[in-house]
Amino acid sequence: MYRLGLLFACALAAYGQKINVEFDRGADFAKFKTFAIRAGNLNSRNPALNSELVKKQIEADIERSLSAKGLEMTTGRSDLNLRDTLGSARRVETEAYPAGWYGWGTRIVRVPYAEGTLVIDLRDPTTRSLVWRAIATEEQRDPSKLQGKLDSMVKKSFDKYPPKVK
């Protein structure tokens, strides 16, 4: 029974959020003390995502996450300029269910869903170069859970800030 539970937990983990972070290894992240949020983009045909309320929520989550890391938000000159982009794409999940002997009657089921992507860029305004980027992707099957998913995507993205250079 323990093995079955472990297998189920591993299967669930495969369907979770995907967070990818890349950064400039030559950047000195200790010098960044302030940030400013610049106009982001909402690139979605999904009306649940293409909303000013969603944009404000993302910006509030970002501000909360960076403030917890010791950075201060400013509206003037800043050490980092932040821009976020939210988009969504239609995807189709295909599953095959064998229904009979010798492969006869295999049933194919296609389930459409939306996949949301949040890209957060941090740029150094003095050099105008990208110093840190997080790309968070997750399935959006239930619109009522959107707010919690966005909160989680932002938090998990900034769990990897500042990056640890190896």
Feature-to-residue mapping (PLM):
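Short, charged/polar low-complexity linear motifs in solvent-exposed/disordered segments
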Residues: 38, 92, 99-100, 148-151
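Residues that line or immediately flank small-molecule/substrate-binding pockets and catalytic motifs
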Residues: 8, 39, 138
